[in-house]
Amino acid sequence: MIYPKIPLAQSIIEICNTKGLHHIVISPGSRNAPLTIGFTNNPVFTCYSIADERCAAFFALGIAQQLKKPVALVCTSGSALLNYYPAFAEAFYSQIPLVVISADRPQSKIDIGDGQTIRQENVFANHSLYNANLVENVSEENDAKIQEAIHLATTKKGPVHINVPFEEPLYETVDTISVNTKIIDFDTENKPLENLDVFVNRWNDAKKKLILIGGCDPNVIQQFIIDFLANDTSVVVMTEVTSNVHHANFITNIDAIITPFTDDDFTNFQPEILITMGGMIVSKRIKAFLRKYKPQQHWHIDELRAYDTFGSLTKHFEVLPSVFFKEFIPKINSLESNYLPYSLEIKKVRTQKTNTYLATIPFSDFKAFEIILPKLPLYSQLQISNSSAIRYAQLFSIHSSIEVFCNRGTSGIDGSTSTAIGAAIASGKETILITGDISFLYDSNALWNNYIPENFKIILLNNGGGGIFRILPGHKENETFNTYFETSHRLTAKYLAKMYNFGYEKAVDEKTLAEKLKITINTKKSIILEVFTPTKVNDLVLLNYFKNLT
């Protein structure tokens, strides 16, 4: 086998292998040549070459999102490293393990005017779980730092940074390894669940308990929890589309429920106890409601973090939901309440009004989502881009067999396509990305990728700009708005599809969308379905929807 001659590179490769870090996303460069040589010449590693570092990082994020294990990113020195930052921040807030391994020049070459050189040490400090700044020579201290970084990425679920100085020559190889790495076995800390008696008493006394579930991996909220929560009349469960949690008694279309509320409705719906699980919340309306009508108690259940999103957090249970509810459920009493029946009656009325309204609207983004979502393949994976796409998806129910993901850690539009491609590769599932035109164009280099599988398909809603700005309070139809907010355009994905060997279909109305969607779903290759919707109709259709709910 071929190894890099530089001992420090050998140590990194040996430790990655021993610790099970086997998926390596490499961006071409010279300074990282020792790592590239070592990883690509060892068959235990699955290596990917992605030239654009920003795309590479989101691609790795998608793989790690699905594998639930760290993925390594390897880049050269200089600004290449900075291009990882958007995905690095997303990994931090979405709790996805990434290990960035950046090649650097030796410390003596920093800030002396050498080319392709920046201050790389601690460059991700604000969003990194650990920063391992290595020195040139092999040492136990270096080995310990590398292993600590991988351990924390794995157990604390987030990104870490290993900065590695290499001096030239960089391309020399040897046939045998020269390092003897000391492997560290880390203790895994599991926090015990505290005595719940006080919380059980509070629960038993409360007639209005609201459960709000944000983004979760599939099966994190187990069926026994779902059954318990769904059948207590004092409990209302609201789930976001990314929660991957389903029950007929749960409320999925949160905004449709609460947008028409009067002050009296808000007061009646105000919970005494709020329990939150999962990641970031998409709905602005539920956040505004809970910040104004605060619960007496807010408990968050998560092994690692708890954000005080509503300014009312009183308790963080640092365990998995399954651990908490397994202990909690046997201790509580059922309580008759009108909270759930009241909410389900509202849900029934809102659903009827929604169906009536959808039957009357013209072709638009809203109508397109109504047509697309029920036709998605069962047991597939749905990746959704940010901005208006995820908000439209929130207005519909999605079949329980479909797994839903969205980069809601930082809610950026910048890497949705790259993430979805990585996720499609790692999951092996039929993967559909629903994206808006600005998000798609922003990340079009994602298609510059030799690993795109046939199970990956894109449904692109092209409304000629950033349509979400038309439904925000600052919308005014003028040149400033069109240019600097909406970023109006007349671009199409047709020739990008041709350049990157994607299939391409086009829809412009309900009839062609139904026809082309069927073709897209049944096609056995990667394909883009571009759906053109009217720029100046979409916002009115959506705004009138909420007016019609009253």
UniProtKB/Swiss-Prot annotation:
Against Gene3D superfamilies, the record matches this protein to: 3.40.50.970, TPP-binding domain
The protein's required cofactors: Mg(2+); Mn(2+); thiamine diphosphate
Q: In which pathway does it act?
A: Quinol/quinone metabolism; 1,4-dihydroxy-2-naphthoate biosynthesis; 1,4-dihydroxy-2-naphthoate from chorismate: step 2/7; Quinol/quinone metabolism; menaquinone biosynthesis
Name the domain of life: Bacteria
> How is the co-factor bound, per the entry?
Binds 1 thiamine pyrophosphate per subunit.
Q: Which UniProt keywords apply?
A: Magnesium, Manganese, Menaquinone biosynthesis, Metal-binding, Thiamine pyrophosphate, Transferase
Which Pfam family, any one, appears in the UniProt record? TPP_enzyme_C
Instruction: Please name the InterPro entries in this protein's record.
Output: MenaQ_synth_MenD (IPR004433), THDP-binding (IPR029061), Thiamin_PyroP_enz_TPP-bd_dom (IPR012001), TPP_enzyme_TPP-bd (IPR011766)
- EC number assigned by the record: 2.2.1.9
Which residues pair up as cystines? none
Alphabetized GO MF terms: 2-succinyl-5-enolpyruvyl-6-hydroxy-3-cyclohexene-1-carboxylic-acid synthase activity; magnesium ion binding; manganese ion binding; thiamine pyrophosphate binding
Asked whether the UniProt record includes Metal-binding among its keywords, one would answer: yes
One example of a Gene Ontology biological process annotation: menaquinone biosynthetic process
Reaction equations catalysed: isochorismate + 2-oxoglutarate + H(+) = 5-enolpyruvoyl-6-hydroxy-2-succinyl-cyclohex-3-ene-1-carboxylate + CO2
Quaternary assembly:
Homodimer.
| UniProt similarity note | Belongs to the TPP enzyme family. MenD subfamily.
- Purpose of the protein: Catalyzes the thiamine diphosphate-dependent decarboxylation of 2-oxoglutarate and the subsequent addition of the resulting succinic semialdehyde-thiamine pyrophosphate anion to isochorismate to yield 2-succinyl-5-enolpyruvyl-6-hydroxy-3-cyclohexene-1-carboxylate (SEPHCHC).
Its protein name is 2-succinyl-5-enolpyruvyl-6-hydroxy-3-cyclohexene-1-carboxylate synthase
Q: Which organism is it from?
A: Flavobacterium psychrophilum (strain ATCC 49511 / DSM 21280 / CIP 103535 / JIP02/86)
